[in-house]
Amino acid sequence: MTAQSNITPESIVADLRYLQLLSRSFPTIAAASTEIINLEAILNLPKGTEHFLTDIHGEYEAFQHVLKNASGAVKRKVNEIFGHTLREIEKKELCTLIYYPEEKLQLIKATETDIDDWYLITLNQLVKVCQNVSSKYTRSKVRKSLPAEFSYIIQELLHESTIEPNKHAYINVIISTIISTRRADDFIIAMCNLIQRLTIDSLHIVGDIYDRGPGAHIIMDTLCDYHNFDIQWGNHDILWMGAASGNEACMANVIRLSMRYGNLGTLEDGYGINLLPLATFAMDTYADDPCTIFAPKTNFADSTYNEKTLRLITQMHKAITIIQFKLEANIINRRPEFGMGGRKLLEKIDFERGVFVYEGKEYPLRDTNFPTVDPADPYRLTDEEQELIEKIHYSFMNSEKLKKHMRCLFTYGGMYLVCNSNLLYHARSEERRVGKECR
């Protein structure tokens, strides 16, 4: 029985709403047939390479390197294509050129004695690599990925073969003319970037772009311009989304984490958050307090700090931590249904005796200097703290780059994603065993 024999007047009427909708894009039988042929053909192409990254935590240099080499996929392609026809050192040189074309070209030009000959060999090698990585895509998809400046030339090189006698001279002249017109450097850079792009068909960021690293904003700059990606939000990403949405407890938390790891670059340089009011407040409030236990973890710091700067960051860390406790407690009081009463910590402190009381047990405090905490009303912000948090709020709400990056997170992100029969989500999901089933 054919598919056509299943079509009845009743089924047409039942599907009329969908047929009318489809007719907007495919008004004729020919248009619909062409699209069906195209989609059926695409389904029989090899699946594009999916790249999964998680827990980046602001480490932008590692992130960018992994994107450039596609976690070793480029190296594998080069080995498959050239095998034993190139020495290992030559394959490594070619891979490095693909990863970092601008930098590698400068090194090559400083040492190569016959640069035109090197251009000729390298361009032919790059064409072979590009033909390989583009082979799993339709010509239409490859064409849309090409740089406009060299689109026509690259299409000719990708889809014509030097083995064909009638095209051998044609291809060779294209390459030699690229060299003679002094466009080889730009063309090589364009080809290397294209190889990087085609090697990764889709990028999955499975949580935590933000946290302790110094360059989360640089990572977000890269993602905002990336060709195909999705994000499954991690706890640190959601924290920044909350801060950018105006939640002051989240603002205090992201600042505290930055102080803890000595990374101020994302806040100050990336998003223009003014930390001067916090520094002034911390120096005044904790002038004689060493704040020892709030010293930053300098092995994660974005730069080397002198002793004076480290002391200031330590004071700022303590100041914003106390403010965070107060702001979070106010939310918990306002929303008891959250069931987070156990997170209200300041009320569990016996300030006179310097102990923390939890479930009937007492724990001595390692720090007992809390000049901004009123034991009778521990979660009330002082006037100075209230003024400070208003200034911090203003900085967060008026950062244009932060708004851009958070729009990207909201647009391309979600709590989870089902893709190619994979369930993607950050961290873990609690399971309950019911009989023989996990739910």
What are these model-predicted stretches?
Residues 2-439:
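Feature recognizes metal-dependent phosphohydrolase scaffolds
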